[in-house]
Amino acid sequence: MELEVLRFSSQKDSTNGVLFDVTGGIRKFLCYTLEDEYREDKVMGETRIPSGTYNITLRTTGGFHGRYVKKYGQMHKGMLWVRDVPGFEYILIHTGNTDEHTAGCLLLGDSQQANFGSSDGMVGSSVNAYKRVYPPIAKALEEGESVSITYTNFDYVG
């Protein structure tokens, strides 16, 4: 399975994007995304990860995993963990609404607020998006399929 995040707006506190399933060369929209902003020099918990392609595995330890087992029950097989990101660790794909919920992770949502002007950006209906997007990815991983995610920058970060 191949996923792609297209980042299209990076502002002072956040980056807006969209997530696609691009398996087999067909681009299928999955949901909107929100991450921390671009920074030349990383600030712990306040910086989006570099563009590139990374593998995803399931992480079955840690606080997020325990909370998601309670929240989502049998649907939850482990946190979607974006692996081997240079200078970053424990980058997860999870629910949340604003840049305050990201700490470098990728938030999913079914709606999105612009992140320019007085807004820091926001994704809405995050739990609904997660409940829809998570199961096929977790299933692919459980069946031994390789899952990758490519982060592509279409935003101006200069």
Regions found by a protein language model. Name each.
Residues 1-158:
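Cell wall/extracellular polymer interaction/catalysis modules
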